[in-house]
């Protein structure tokens, strides 16, 4: 519907012509446009079709073998098998020369561009064999490489940034240890405090709000602490715990550090299973990634003690990768039919693994040297249901806990297997002796826990009924069978925690929250038996001087917190902390002193006692003085507040007298006061008696 023209514009031809004239958008004469099309229409030009459209899903694979036509089909099957893991392949072209021989490269088209990018990410630098390593690039990258300027321009000099001292925590002259305490302030929001265990009261170093979404974890040598977030994980370090590196891996649930802190492994869920990524900690670069079937695959990688190798178990094989290339050792896996478990020695490049029984062939435990792949010891085992491998921390001994059965019962389809008449063997391998002799200890009761003394030659076992178990201590010596040195009967413990320095052990019941502290060199006397109701964790400090028990809000929601004890079980500190979730001592790197120097210090330790005792007295005196000064300051603050309020009370006296009928009640004596009793009816009830 046309709009009626207003009367203001209906009076003359001049007005009509001005009203109907269209506006002029032309540039004035001599106008210079200083705005480029990219600035004005950058978002639209970014969507402009280009010559490369349609080839984003094509990759170029270089350095493939040059083969004759008779071997081409075999080459195609090998390459298709590798590249089909990244997506659906639409077309493959292998250029050939006049004789029909391949030219050493191929063009591969995927269904989607994202699949092509995944192929470049996973298979670039993939080593096919000794002489061929793939170079995989997107077809669209050629344009990028063509536009490289011919004239080299030197990079701009970046200003030097002072790096954090990552090892300042071990420079404390009194060698006080550090620990962190985590408490959940809200959902997916955890506050973490860092403390130094100074006597007589710990010193707070740093507190971070919203530091992590779930929990934290120290690296093996205490250099870094890792935090978890939705986009990935980050590591922090230095005196003020600054961010050192971040690793983007969405939904990371678990991480592992290599023993020397060179690499980090992150585990995160995918729609089909778990994705595992190995990162270089110093550069933040992704070294290799894996996809595992199933959502509960955690800690599937095992590192050698020196970070030279990392291994994982496959179907009837062990895959050992060399660092830093992360290629398979000798470019192939180690085939071991029936393998069920393996573990690295904590001090040597030796792998221990066990194989299940197959077709009347007994189970077997094998020691293998790496990288030679030479088997140094085999031990056959019969009637085996399961095995667990336990290395002593110093690598001197290996204990294999063998679950054995007297009778095997199978159903008709052999899908359900029941083991009857269970008993247990402990096979002790003497790793430092010639030909690795093996001793055996048999126990006919249910095994609840096993633990090696970290430094020493003893191990302990909890066996029997859970509510009335026995704790046995065995000693291992050269040339003789392991001997039972002590048995503590009728103990209600479920876990064993040795001191990192040996000698002392905590027998814990993490169901009831009871603990017993035992000295293994003093006839296994129980020095203390404290309780910490609902405690769910026990943490020794790295020096073996203190023990912490904690009640985490992951287990219960009330009375959460932690207790700190001496190695003899004497309580030092009780801390109640709402929504407490985690307590972790900061690990220490190994000492730089030689064994001879350590022995010399232990031998002459008595001459250091006077200096230590004097320092302790000074510290306690200083602490007492600081405590008295603090109390005096609090008293002065209180008296100042009290006098201020008394002054206000006196200033209000005239108003009080007026409000109280001009009677000064401030100075009334009790004898001048008359008591008046007033009674009134509150409630009346009538009860009929028969």
Curated annotation (Swiss-Prot):
InterPro entries in the record: EIF3B (IPR011400), eIF3B_RRM (IPR034363), Nucleotide-bd_a/b_plait_sf (IPR012677), RBD_domain_sf (IPR035979), RRM_dom (IPR000504), TIF_beta_prop-like (IPR013979), WD40/YVTN_repeat-like_dom_sf (IPR015943)
Protein location: Cytoplasm
PROSITE patterns (alphabetical): RRM (PS50102)
A Gene Ontology cellular-component term: eukaryotic translation initiation factor 3 complex
Record flagged with keyword Protein biosynthesis: yes
GO BP term, pick one: formation of cytoplasmic translation initiation complex
Domain called RRM: residue spans: 57-141
UniProt key word RNA-binding: yes
WD repeats mapped onto the chain: 207-246, 247-289, 293-331, 334-369, 442-484, 530-575
Pfam families found in the cross-reference section: eIF2A (PF08662), RRM_1 (PF00076)
Role according to the record: RNA-binding component of the eukaryotic translation initiation factor 3 (eIF-3) complex, which is involved in protein synthesis of a specialized repertoire of mRNAs and, together with other initiation factors, stimulates binding of mRNA and methionyl-tRNAi to the 40S ribosome. The eIF-3 complex specifically targets and initiates translation of a subset of mRNAs involved in cell proliferation.
Family the UniProt entry places it in: Belongs to the eIF-3 subunit B family.
Subunit structure: Component of the eukaryotic translation initiation factor 3 (eIF-3) complex. The eIF-3 complex interacts with pix. Interacts with mxt.
Protein name: Eukaryotic translation initiation factor 3 subunit B
Lineage: Eukaryota, Metazoa, Ecdysozoa, Arthropoda, Hexapoda
Gene responsible for this protein: eIF3b
């Amino acid at each position: 519907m046309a709009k009626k023209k207003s009367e203001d514009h209906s009076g003359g031809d001049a007005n009509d012509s001005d009203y109907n004239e269209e506006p002029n958008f032309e540039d004035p004469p001599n106008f210079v446009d200083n705005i480029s099309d990219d600035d004005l229409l950058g978002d639209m030009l970014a969507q402009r079709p280009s010559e490369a459209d349609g080839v984003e899903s094509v990759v170029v694979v270089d350095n493939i073998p040059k083969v004759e036509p008779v071997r081409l089909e075999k080459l195609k099957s090998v390459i298709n098998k590798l590249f089909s893991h990244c997506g659906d392949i639409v077309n493959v072209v292998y250029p050939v020369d006049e004789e029909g021989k391949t030219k050493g490269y191929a063009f591969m088209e995927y269904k989607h561009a994202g699949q092509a990018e995944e192929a470049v990410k996973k298979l670039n630098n993939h080593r096919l064999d000794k002489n061929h390593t793939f170079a995989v690039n997107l077809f669209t990258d050629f344009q990028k490489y063509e536009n490289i300027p011919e004239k080299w321009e030197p990079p701009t000099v970046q200003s030097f940034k002072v790096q954090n001292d990552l090892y300042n925590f071990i420079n404390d002259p009194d060698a006080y240890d550090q620990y962190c305490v985590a408490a959940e302030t809200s959902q997916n929001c955890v506050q973490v405090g860092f403390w130094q265990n100074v006597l007589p009261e710990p010193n707070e170093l740093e507190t971070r709000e919203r530091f992590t979404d779930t929990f934290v974890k120290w690296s093996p040598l205490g250099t870094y602490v890792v935090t978890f977030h939705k986009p990935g994980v980050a590591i922090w370090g230095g005196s003020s715990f600054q961010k050192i590196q971040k690793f983007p891996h969405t939904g990371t649930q678990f991480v592992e550090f290599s023993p020397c802190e060179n690499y980090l492994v992150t585990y995160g869920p995918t729609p089909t299973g778990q994705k595992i990524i190995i990162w270089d900690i110093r550069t933040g670069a992704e070294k290799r990634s894996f996809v595992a079937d199933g959502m509960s695959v955690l800690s599937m990688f095992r590192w050698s003690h020196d970070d030279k190798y990392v291994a994982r178990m496959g179907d009837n094989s062990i895959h050992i990768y060399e660092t830093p290339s992360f290629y398979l050792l000798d470019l192939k896996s180690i085939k071991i039919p029936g393998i069920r478990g393996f573990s690295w020695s904590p001090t040597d490049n030796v792998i221990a693994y066990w194989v299940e029984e197959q077709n009347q062939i007994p189970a077997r435990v094998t020691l293998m040297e790496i990288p030679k792949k030479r088997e140094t010891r085999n031990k056959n085992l019969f009637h085996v249901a399961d095995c667990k491998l336990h290395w002593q921390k110093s690598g001197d001994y290996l204990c294999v806990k063998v679950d054995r059965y007297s009778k095997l019962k199978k159903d008709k389809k052999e899908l359900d297997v029941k083991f009857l008449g269970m008993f247990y063997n402990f096979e002790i391998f003497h790793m430092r002796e010639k030909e690795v002799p093996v001793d055996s200890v048999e126990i006919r009761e249910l095994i609840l826990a096993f633990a090696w003394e970290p430094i020493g030659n003893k191990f302990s076992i909890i066996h029997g009924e859970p509510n009335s178990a026995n704790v046995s201590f065995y000693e291992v010596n050269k040339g003789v069978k392991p001997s039972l040195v002590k048995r503590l009967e009728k103990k209600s413990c479920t876990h064993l925690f040795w001191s990192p320095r040996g000698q002392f052990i905590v027998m814990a019941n993490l169901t009831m929250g009871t603990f017993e502290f035992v000295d293994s060199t003093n006839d296994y006397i129980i020095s203390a038996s404290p309780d910490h109701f609902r405690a769910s964790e026990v943490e020794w400090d790295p020096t073996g001087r203190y023990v912490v028990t904690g009640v985490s809000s992951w287990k219960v929601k009330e009375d959460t917190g932690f207790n700190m004890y001496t190695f003899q079980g004497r309580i030092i500190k009780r801390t109640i902390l709402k929504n407490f979730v985690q307590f972790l001592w900061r690990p220490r790197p190994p000492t730089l002193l030689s064994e001879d120097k350590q022995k010399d210090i232990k031998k002459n330790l008595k001459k250091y006692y006077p200096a230590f005792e004097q320092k302790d007295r000074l510290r306690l005196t200083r602490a007492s003085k600081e405590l008295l000064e603090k109390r005096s300051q609090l008293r002065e603050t209180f008296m100042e507040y009290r006098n201020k309020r008394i002054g206000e009370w006196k200033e209000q006296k005239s108003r009080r007298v007026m409000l109280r009928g001009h009677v000064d009640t401030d100075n009334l004596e009790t004898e001048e006061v008359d008591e008046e009793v007033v009674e009134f009816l509150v409630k009346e009830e009538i009860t009929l008696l028969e």
